[in-house]
From Swiss-Prot:
Ranges for the Kelch repeats: 94-144, 146-198, 199-253, 254-303, 305-351, 355-402
Biased composition (Polar residues): 18-32, 385-403, 408-465, 472-489, 519-547
GO molecular function, one term: protein-membrane adaptor activity
Location of the region described as Disordered in the Swiss-Prot/TrEMBL record: 1-64, 384-403, 408-547
SMART domains: Kelch (SM00612)
Coiled-coil residue windows: 611-649, 716-838, 879-990, 1084-1105
Protein name, entry field: Tip elongation aberrant protein 1
Domain of life: Eukaryota
Length: 1147
């Protein structure tokens, strides 16, 4: 579906004229003179005939710019308010109407089109995404796109407002919802939509009690694209105050807004938005600006803004019309226009050429209007005309160039004052004839026929201005009784009884009208040519004419009464009509108060006075004419009587002659002819007298009828005055009642204000809750969407995760086993570390003991040397003592050795306790490690454990290095001992007699040899333990390496290789660690081999036999010494015997 966004920029300034309008050429607006006075002059040189009908139908060309358009099918559309339309008709012919509140007080979403060419409403059945029922929305027509946004769409406060943009293709009648990315303006109502270039601009509006003043734009060129979005206009200065119910329009590529309300204040300011500068500015205006209002309608025609209606701050509906010239920034008030529509708000005003079309609107309670009104803007000329002061009407508004008042203008003036008007078929003069003119007129004025009553102006709807029955100038009293029917509303009435009774002539009436500053309505009747011709005839023809006029007037009154009062249509006689006059008058007076309560009472009183003056004036003129006729008839009668008296004298003479007096023949003939002539004249005079008597009797009857009718009129005037007095009393009572009602209303208003304040507080809280609920809904919707996406993804990944979960379960089980094994290995490593630490302590103790042994051995050697010297030099008596001393020393050394063994046992006990504590700590660590079930964490823990094992291996390696250094020192010392032994053997071979030196060397060197032998044994034991631990560790690592290889082989067959890389990395790291452990084990093996080799060498040295070349005794002694040394060496490897050897006893 494609839209053609064609915007005729000239349509707002140079509109095309519709087909139904025929307008003559008018001067351009540039030729008009502007004025600072707020007045208007209407051009009478141009008359636009909106709906031209035949003259026989009763329609008339009116001077009012307002007119009604008779539309077919309007009952289905109107009354309606808060609907949406567009400012300019499509092609000058069609106006689209959407939504609003109809007569059933329910929001609608129906679509109608008004065709101005055919004057018909047509319902359009649309398809697609039709907007929901709404009111207070905004719309605009651009090309073939009818665009709708916003409106009050929710039926509940908690519901969410619709903030979508809807587009209707007027060619295909298909609705489409615009897809806009990003943020959207919030739903609202009472806003406006305008077009600036290719963008539609949204301004203002309200949402419950919050009013907006943001300007949001939507580019139609980006419709249905990825760039389709709403953009908030960044304004450089402060925008207008927030408002709703305003009007907006574009002119010269600028956006204007006028009026509106923010709930508390009503505005009448005009603001302009400059899109190039992106700034707002308040327009300074001149002239009389409209009152602050909201809910009004406006449209622009040829650079002039027309504003109509709305609702004021006090809640009253308005029907005033204002014009604003955008070039001069001047306001004009177009006041006192006839046929102005009733007050209303929430209506629409569309432009079709030079004509504005008013549709719908909300009115007061009980008021409804189903009419479509049209305003012809070509009738206005915004020029300089002097204004009138006081209550004087601006008659120049309806005057032509010559200054003569035409009937339509006069009719319009009456309509503007809401007094019913009367039009004759031909009107020659609007001035009232004076009483002297009536007296000086001929008898033909008395013979005028009853004129035809004109239909209402323009012939639109007779129910708006019904024509009252006009009384004729007949002699019949029934004809002189008028029946009144007003189409105006009742208002204030003044007490004008003194004025009514003081002046009855036309001069006084005109003076009163001039004093009051008003032009009184007039009735002007023109006599027909037939009645004019018969006015010059005889008295008999005049009587016939009067009788004919009377019968026609009676028939006309009966016809009108049959239309007005159907129940009285059977009454056709004059007597029956007389009986109905009171009923008609009572009915019409009762309807005055009911139907026309809005008109001022002063205007009703003035209207009654004018009608009463007209009736009295007509009756006075009739009475004057009758008196003149009576005077003429009496004069003719007197003349005839005189002539008859004079004729009686020759008649008497003729009678005397006939009695007996005779004359000559000639004289007799002459006299006979004279008598015959006289007799003929007498006969004619007699007939004339009879006619005069008849006429005088008729005149007497007419005079009596006239006097009776005058009396009846006086009675009627008195009754009218009584009714006026009663009406004033009613008015006073009603005014008192109104005051009481106003006081009650004020109290109620206070209560209502309090309730409104409470309602406002409640609505604020409800709005907060609704806002929070909307946020919660949005968040929940987002959460639901994310959950749906996650469920979809989870469903997609479940199939993949099944196999992974199975493999992970197997891996986890195996990994748990590995973790347990690693924990055991770690515990064993901790134990080995503790053993190594204990061995280090023992080694330190051994070094300390070694130093002590060296000192003790030095002392013992020194003592042995001294004793040997003594033995050699001394006698044998001292040998036993010496031997005993040696035995004592040996015992002391054995005791010391036992102490040291106890210390070693204590260290072993401490080592066992430490091992148990380490085992408990290891069990705690294993329990903590079993809580980790994630594969990555377990791998990381394994890596950390391997790193710790490596650190421990490094520390063990360092200790091994230290042991190697100690072993190297021990080997060097062993080499030194070998050298010493070799030197001693060589010395014995060279000088076998020098036993003392050899013995001293042996005594001096046996203790360090014993110590070294003992250290080597301890070192061999520790190395064997370490070798066994590293063997177990190597076995475990080889098993673990095989397990990892099996896992890698399993994972290679599967597609997902997400776990291969870390396993390969772990495998490579562990293989490197295993290699390093293997190297350590090989080093330990080599070290143990070297130690074993050293031990074997020591044993070989111990087993070697030294050559002896001395005597037998000395050889025996040397042998005993060597055996003793062997025993010492054996005591270093194992516990020495507690008892002394046998050879000691022998010695």
């Amino acid at each position: 579906m494609s839209f053609l966004f064609k915007r005729n920029k000239g349509s707002a300034h140079k509109p095309t004229k519709p087909n139904f309008s025929k307008t003559s050429t008018t001067p351009s607006t540039s030729q008009l003179k502007h004025s600072h006075e707020s007045n208007v002059k209407m051009s009478t040189s141009t008359v636009t005939e909106h709906r031209k009908k035949p003259t026989g139908s009763g329609s008339h060309i009116t001077a009012s710019p307002w007119s009604k358009l008779t539309v077919r099918g309007s009952s289905n559309v109107l009354p309606r308010y808060s609907h949406a339309s567009h400012l300019y008709a499509e092609g000058g012919q069609e106006i689209y109407i959407f939504g609003g509140v109809a007569s059933d007080s329910q929001p609608k979403n129906d679509l109608w089109v008004l065709n101005l060419a055919t004057s018909q409403f047509t319902s359009l059945r649309s398809l697609g995404e039709t907007p929901s029922p709404r009111l207070g929305h905004a719309s605009i027509l651009i090309g073939n796109a009818f665009i709708v946004f916003g409106g009050l769409t929710n039926h509940d406060v908690a519901d969410r407002q619709d903030n979508s943009l809807y587009l209707l293709n007027t060619s295909s009648l298909v609705w489409q919802k615009a897809n806009a990315s990003g943020a959207r303006p919030s739903g609202r109502y009472g806003h406006t939509i305008s077009c600036l270039g290719s963008k539609i601009c949204l301004f203002g509006g309200r949402l419950l009690d919050y009013y907006f003043n943001d300007l949001v734009c939507f580019d139609l060129n980006n419709l249905n694209t990825s760039d389709s979005r709403w953009e908030l206009a960044s304004v450089v200065n402060d925008p207008p105050p927030a408002r709703a119910g305003h009007v907006a329009f574009t002119f010269s590529d600028k956006l204007y807004i006028f009026g509106g309300t923010d709930g508390a204040n009503f505005f009448n300011d005009l603001w302009c938005y400059h899109p190039k500068q992106s700034a707002w500015s308040k327009v300074e205006t001149f002239g009389v600006a409209p009152n602050p209002r909201a809910g009004h309608a406006a449209s622009v025609v040829e650079g002039i803004l027309y504003v109509f209606g709305g609702r004021a701050s006090d809640g009253t509906f308005l029907n005033d019309l204002y014009a604003f010239r955008l070039s001069s920034k001047h306001w004009y008030k177009l006041s006192d226009l006839p046929f102005t529509p009733s007050p209303r708000s929430s209506h629409t005003l569309s432009c079709s050429g030079l004509t504005l079309v008013l549709i719908g609107g909300k009115q007061g309670k009980g008021a409804s209007d189903s009419n479509v009104y049209m305003l012809d803007t070509s009738r206005f000329r915004l020029g300089s005309v002097p204004t009138t002061s006081g209550r004087q009407r601006n008659t120049s508004f309806f005057s032509n160039s010559t200054g003569n008042t035409n009937p339509s203008a006069f009719n319009g003036l009456l309509t503007s004052s809401r007094i019913p008007s009367y039009n004759g078929s031909k009107v020659r003069s609007t001035s009232h004839p004076s009483r002297q003119q009536y007296i000086g007129s001929s008898n033909s004025r008395f013979n005028t026929r009853h004129q035809t009553i004109s239909t209402p102006v323009s012939g639109r709807a007779s129910n708006d201005l019904p024509s009252p029955v006009v009384p004729t100038r007949s002699n019949s009293s029934s004809i002189l009784q008028p029946s009144y029917n007003l189409n105006s509303h009742s208002s204030d009435r003044r007490n004008t009884n003194d004025d009514d009774q003081s002046s009855l002539n036309s001069q006084q009436l005109s003076n009163q009208a001039k004093a009051q500053g008003e032009v009184s309505p007039t009735l002007s009747f023109v006599p027909s040519s037939h009645s004019m011709e018969q006015g010059n005839g005889s008295v008999a023809s005049a009587n016939n004419a009067q009788s004919e006029a009377a019968t026609r007037s009676i028939n006309s009154i009966s016809e009108v009464s049959e239309v007005r009062f159907p129940e009285q249509s059977s009454v056709k006689t004059v007597d029956e009509r007389k009986s109905l006059d009171g009923r008609i008058t009572s009915v019409t007076l009762e309807t005055l108060v009911e139907k026309y309560s809005e008109l001022s009472k002063q205007q009703i009183v003035e209207w009654f006075k004018s009608k009463l003056y007209e009736i009295l004036r007509d009756s006075a003129s009739k009475i004057d004419s009758l008196t003149e006729k009576l005077k003429v008839a009496n004069a003719e009668k007197n003349a005839a009587l005189c002539e008859a008296a004079l004729e009686k004298v020759p008649l008497a003479k003729h009678n005397k002659l006939s009695d007996g007096t005779f004359s000559t023949p000639d004289k007799e003939n002459v006299q006979s002819t004279n008598d015959a002539h006289i007799m003929q004249e007498n006969f004619s005079l007699h007939k004339a007298l009879e006619v005069m008597r008849e006429t005088s009797s008729d005149l007497d009857k007419q005079l009596k009828d006239a006097t009776a009718s005058q009396k009846e009129l006086i009675v009627q005037t008195s009754s009218f005055q009584k009714e006026l007095v009663e009406e004033r009393e009613r008015h006073n009572a009603i005014s008192k009642r109104l005051q009481e009602i106003e006081s009650l209303y004020r109290d109620r208003e206070l209560l209502v204000t309090n309730l409104e304040d409470q309602l406002v507080d409640q609505t604020v809280t409800i709005n907060k809750f609704a806002f929070e609920r909307d946020q919660f809904r949005e968040r929940s919707m987002g959460f639901e969407n994310t959950i749906k996406d996650l469920t979809r993804k989870m469903e997609a990944t479940d199939m993949l995760n099944v196999s992974l979960h199975e493999s992970l379960r197997s891996v986890q089980t195996e990994n748990s086993e590995l973790v347990t094994e690693m924990a055991l290995l770690k515990a064993e490593l901790v134990k080995k570390q503790a053993i190594i630490d204990a061995n280090a302590n023992i080694y330190d103790k051994l070094t300390a003991d070694h130093t002590n042994y060296e000192t003790v051995s030095a002392d013992i050697n020194q003592n042995l040397k001294e004793t040997l010297d003594k033995l050699l030099n001394g006698s044998s008596d001292f040998k036993n003592n010496e031997i005993e001393l040696l035995h004592d020393q040996i015992r002391i050394t054995n005791a010391k050795l036992e102490k040291r063994e106890k210390l070693i046992n204590a260290s072993k006990y401490i080592e066992d306790t430490l091992r148990s504590e380490i085992q408990e700590a290891a069990e705690k660590v294993s329990n903590l490690e079993f809580s980790n079930f994630n594969l990555k964490e377990e791998n990381s823990n394994m890596q950390l454990q391997l790193m710790k094992a490596l650190e421990q291996r490094n520390t063990g390696a360092k200790q091994l290095v230290n042991l190697r250094m100690q072993l190297s020192t021990a080997t060097s010392e062993l080499d030194m001992l070998k050298l010493k032994l070799r030197t001693t053997a060589l010395a014995l071979e060279e000088s076998p007699d020098d036993y003392s030196d050899i013995l001293s060397i042996l005594r001096a060197d046996m203790s360090p040899f014993h110590d070294l032998h003992k250290q080597c044994g301890v070192l061999i034991d520790t190395l064997n333990g370490v070798k066994r631990g590293f063997g177990i560790f190597e076995k475990k690592f080889t098993d673990y390496h095989k397990f990892l290889e099996n896992i890698s082989d399993k994972l290679k067959s599967e597609e997902d290789t997400s776990l291969e890389t870390p396993i390969h990395e772990n495998q490579s790291i562990q293989s490197d660690q295993i290699k390093e452990v293997g190297e350590v084990l090989s080093a330990i093996k080599s070290l143990s081999d070297s130690v074993m080799l050293l031990k074997n060498q020591i044993d070989d040295l111990a087993k070697e036999k030294l050559p002896l070349s001395s005597s037998d005794d000395e050889k025996v002694n040397i042998k005993e010494k060597t055996d003793f040394m062997k025993l010492l060496v054996k005591s270093g490897l194992s516990n020495p015997p507690a008892k002394e050897p046998v050879h000691d006893n022998e010695n």
